[in-house]
UniProtKB/Swiss-Prot annotation:
One of its GO terms (cellular component) is host cell nucleus. HAMAP family: HSV_DNBI. A motif (Required for filament formation) lies at residues 849-850. It is found in: Host nucleus. This is Major DNA-binding protein. The keyword Zinc-finger applies. Keywords: DNA replication, DNA-binding, Host nucleus, Metal-binding, Zinc, Zinc-finger. GO terms for molecular function: single-stranded DNA binding; zinc ion binding.
Amino acid sequence: MESAPKTVSLPVSPLGYVYARQKASLQTGTVSLTAARSVDSDLAVLPVIRGLTVEQTFTTNVAVVAGSKTTGLGGTGITLKLTPSHFNPNAFVFYGGSVIGASSNAPNLTRACEAARRRFGFSAFSSPPVENAVETSGEEICASLNLSPETTALYLVVTESFKEMVYVCNTFLHYGGTSTVTIDGQDAMKIPIYPVQLYMPDVNRLASEPFNAKHRSIGDEFVYSRPFFNSDLCRLLHGYVLGPAAVALRVRNLDGVARGAAHLALDENHEGSVLPQDVTFTLFDSTQGNAGKGSGRAQRQGDGSGSKNSASSGIERRLASVMAADTALSVDSIMGAGIYDTELPSVEDWPVLSSGDDTESLEALGAYAARLSGLVGAMVFSANSVLYMTEVDDGGPADGKDGSNPSYHRFYLIAAPYVAGNPQTDKDGRVLPHTADQQAAPINGSNQEFSLDYLALACGFCPQILARLLFYLERCDAGTFGGRNETDALRYLANTLESDVPCGLCNQATRPACAHTTLHRLRQRLPRFGAPVRAPIGIFGTMNSAYSDCDVLGNYASYGALKRPNDNEAPKSIMQDTYRATMERLVNELEQAKLIDKETLAQASPCSAPTSVVHDQASFIGLLSNIKDTIEGAAEQFMRTLVEARDFKIREGLADANHTMSISLDPYSSSFCPVTSFLARRTVFAVLQDLVLSQCHCLFYGQSVEGRNFRNQFQPVLRRRFLDMLNGGFITAKTVTVTVSDSGVLAPDLTRPASEPPTKDYDGDMARVSMEVLRDLRVKNRVLFSNGGANMSEAARARVAGMASAYRRPDKGSNILNGAVGFLVKQYHGVLFPRGHPPGIDTPNPQWFWTLLQRNQMPARLLSKEDIETITAIKRFSDEYSAINFINLTPNNIGELAQFYFANLVLKYCDHSQYFINGLTAIVVGSRRPRDPAAVLAWIDRTINGAADVEPAAQEVLQRLGSNPAAWTGTFTSTNMVRYVMDQRPMVVIGLSISKYNGSAGNNRVFQAGNWNGLNGGKNVCPLMAFDRTRRFVLACPRVGFTCEAGGFGTGVRENTLSEQVRGIVSEGGPMVQTAVFAAVLHALGARTQHLAVDDWIGLVDDEFLAASLDALNATVVDQFGEWSVEAAQELVKNMEAQTTAGAVAAGEGAFDFGACVGDTPQQSTSAFNGGLAMAAAPAGQKRSLPDDILFDMGAPPEKKSGLTFDML
């Protein structure tokens, strides 16, 4: 639903400022931890933060003085043209940036970027963007301000719409408007920047010769100022602004991108194409096949044409590519003019910097920056990341009954950086002569290894982005465990230290920090690309709203569903009966009973029950009874209210329920550092093009696409088709009306030199009074699995049939340790069964105890009456939960147990059966000090004297971690309490697929749905991810409390990683699981096992209590043998394995019959709720009957008729 129009009053502003500050006044520690700078360049990019890079009173939404026009009789008057915009979230340091610490010590990243640029054919910055340009150096600016060049740093803060204007030298510095502001208690000067179009009335286009002071467009009475050109600034804008945009839009001429974007800033009414007509394309064999199949796999022909319409299919693909890029650039201009509600972040409002003195604050900031390595790493390691969406493929027109209609799925983005070095063609498919000798890589990705060139391509060939990206990759330590010795970075460095590595970037002194060393350490996690398919895309974004529907049942029984039309009931009263409010009350009730702590629910921490709750077996049984009674009572009351008071259709409502979340398009929500802003922008470009490409076949259908003017004629049509898709289910937008808050416009006096003060004698005219501001992306995930419908296509039916087996609930009994209360049993095992351990081992061992019980191998003489009662209570609870469980997730704490139990009861009331529902898991990133020497190689800051000195040098870094606030590595923890994570307004990485469809009959509007999906790469992306179709994952980095106040998975062969081996051992179970796990890890990792922390063990086994016992084994090795060694650890394993079978029942001895415990009878439903409702549960996979539906009196569902007869009509 579209939001109501909003009116915003904007102050008048120049298009940007050049800030001049004393280097000593910069908070270099804080700035360096958030900046992007390569060690081989003084150029840097900083986040725009109030109190850090701009003054506290800095205003973000402004009306920019964008030009002038003649008014009055005879055109003698001048009125200034005003354009709404907001400031870019990044500042560009072009002079004096050496004071800022380098993001990474990796050498020669500029050289690496330029080499990749040449390989892939993108234009370099080698000369001024315009002819006859005159340099304005940093020293000259300092001299004009009477500042010392040696002690001054200069950086540009510019509005989003006009950053390309600065690059193409269509601006000038107005020294007369220089003002002094206070930043962090120190004085700073800022020079306003205005467009040269002020001197050219009624000109709404770029000045191709801005340095021609005698141009005929310049007013006769005006004193023309020299345009602003600084080669270092233009080089920085060329890298950070233009490079990523050019890669995302597949335009190799970066100056063409700059001119197109600058023209859109000046001409707000332009709707046609702005990219050059000579755009080149990558030569590769385009997919041709049945678009309805959705897989994208089909036969190919060498010329890129398919079996159908072969003469035009290649042309259509290339035309769709450039027209989608053109539309995306046009929409990006609309977003640049948008007015956003979020305030620019202030360094004083960052809780992470208020944790203590300067040292503690920097450590906290360094730890938080390391947290983000999990998200940034996921974007690098995922093969379907937006970073690699570099080409457009053609799936071919649809066959079959729908073949005559245009398809929304014919053209789509593919991840194919490996073909970027192929020969280039023109729009007709002719290979350009200067690229004809380049080797063409096959589109199926065979024989392609990920390299630094691909990473440079993903970064837009910007050394600053690449350096900051390496900053995060150097902290990606908690990844998957491949267990391969040749990947040991220490060994690699020692072996190559004294030899010549064909790297071209480093020498012996800089090799530890070299980008190739980092990539080698992580090479088992680097993405592998296969044949291109129509697949989800991995996106980066930020939750800017604390509201989401990510509870187990999503937006079931929401406010909108319960509110009756024309009902005047108070909204608060309705909200009290929603599923969301009921879950809040349930959690609050459990917190009042001191069973959970709400503060820990969002932290993905163990959330264990307080030890004071359970002190003996009786109290544990009471705890289970209390949990059960509380949840069942809440569920009964909730359903009774829905049916009797609200007349809510509970079954239909469940079928319509979705998990939902919104990713903000506000530029300041992702502005922690330049890389997060860069990832957010790449996401926007990918999403825009995905939507635009869906409309290209509709545009081409029935048209002669070979016509010379087709692109110019139909580009405005494609742009309008995209704008019609706004508020269609995926991208939300709001209409904003803008006015000017100032009575007069402060601007340069055009009749006097630029050194003179400004005047306020001008009137201003707003060029855009009303605009659409794109707000957020709506992501949803259906709660129930749907196995088809009458209107589904054959291809869709085939896909659903393949998924049904994954969703079908298996017919098996409960497993205690992996069941509903397994986490409680493991946590309190020492209290409940103090003798529950193998003979010879003093540590209580729940795995050993319950394995023997469930195998009927536990000697009955070892169990007391109280033990048997406790075992019976645990088994009864587990069996009753298992009988109604349709959530393919295991509770890890009481909060999750309550949510899952409650949801299962609702499912039971709604007569759900047979299939698991879709479950959500949030993987929350964290940080810790590193322990493995291989993880700190990039931070070695002394000369290494030979191969034998590599590990001692790394050990020295580990010993001095306290003096390095940036020396942290990332970790992962998971939680199923996703809504509480989303309440922290996190930055997230998620897989997304966008479906497009028409409305009801007679409605040709295109609606969309942003479907929650997966990231290709599985455990390479994150060790806690699992290939499970019934689960959806989101990687999250919370912001509340830090910087603000309170997928289909991978294609190809999946490696048998150590993580998968360990999960297999855990799933098989056994009395001494930790022994088998420890032995497997020791065999794979060797000496590295001693450096594994609890977080690493959790990443391997996904079980907090098992991880703690595994971590304790390392300490046991030291205790028993004096020091840790592989041999000592192996000896410990042998000793423990010898005791594995000890304690089992001997031949002829009586064994405790676990199956005879109450609750092991054929699966029964939970006890009658409040003595009234009897809902018998059928075995899994069968429909449960409702013979005595006393509570609701709804009766059985109506029988479906086999067909519609004439008599019925």
